[in-house]
UniProtKB/Swiss-Prot annotation:
Keyword Membrane carried by entry: yes
Family: Belongs to the RGI1 family.
Gene Ontology cellular component terms for the protein in this record: plasma membrane
Domain of life: Eukaryota
Organism ancestry: Eukaryota, Fungi, Dikarya, Ascomycota, Saccharomycotina
Presence of the UniProt keyword Membrane in the record: yes
Purpose of the protein: Involved in the control of energetic metabolism and significantly contribute to cell fitness, especially under respiratory growth conditions.
GO terms for biological process, alphabetical: energy reserve metabolic process
Cross-referenced InterPro entries: RGI1, RGI1_sf
Pfam family, one: RGI1
Keywords for this protein: Cell membrane, Membrane
Protein name: Respiratory growth induced protein 1
Organism: Kluyveromyces lactis (strain ATCC 8585 / CBS 2359 / DSM 70799 / NBRC 1267 / NRRL Y-1140 / WM37)
Subcellular location: Cell membrane
Membrane topology: Peripheral membrane protein
């Protein structure tokens, strides 16, 4: 038996604009990557994407994605309620811990709903190791699947040039 690679597993995807985005399929790998980037002082230039089944969905299906109910999607009030609780109480909290900013508040929040999907957006400006940066987290669920898309983006704040 061979040793497993301990690093987070991801795929590099190049966008139309030429940006390379790391795409994860496992929540733990995603959180480990964010933690490692913070420790490597790369926390203000990160863009990655996570596509995963939320833990409450996997729990209901006894950890078998094949047994996930078709009703687990953005049209189900129960699914949306549980997903929002998961985002607020677990996902955002875990991200704050991984980037070593437990007091981050995500004051700028928004929710967009359409027939096809529901999108929650969380934005804030913060500072770590003397560097100011913006953090943007977008969570999206769709009407045809229980898979949730999370887009995580951090970018440095550009100082305003005084005239």
């Amino acid at each position: 038996m061979t040793k497993k690679d301990k690093g987070p597993k991801f795929a590099n995807v190049t966008t139309k604009s030429g940006e390379v985005v790391k795409v994860f399929e496992d929540l733990n790998d995603f959180e480990t990557f964010i933690k490692n980037e913070t420790e490597d002082e790369e926390f203000d230039h990160v863009h990655c994407h996570l596509k995963y089944y939320p833990p409450f969905v996997l729990h209901e299906s006894h950890e078998d994605p094949e047994k996930i109910k078709d009703s687990a999607n953005s049209h189900s009030k129960k699914f949306v309620r549980h997903l929002h609780q998961h985002i607020e109480k677990h996902l955002l909290k875990d991200i704050k811990e991984r980037i070593k900013l437990p007091d981050l508040k995500f004051k700028d929040k928004a929710k967009e709903e359409s027939f096809e999907h529901i999108v929650w957006k969380y934005n804030d400006v913060t500072q770590y190791h003397g560097k100011d940066f913006e953090i943007h987290i977008t969570v999206e669920c769709h009407n045809d699947s229980a898979i949730v898309d999370v887009d995580y983006l951090t970018k440095p704040l550009t100082a305003a040039v005084e005239a």
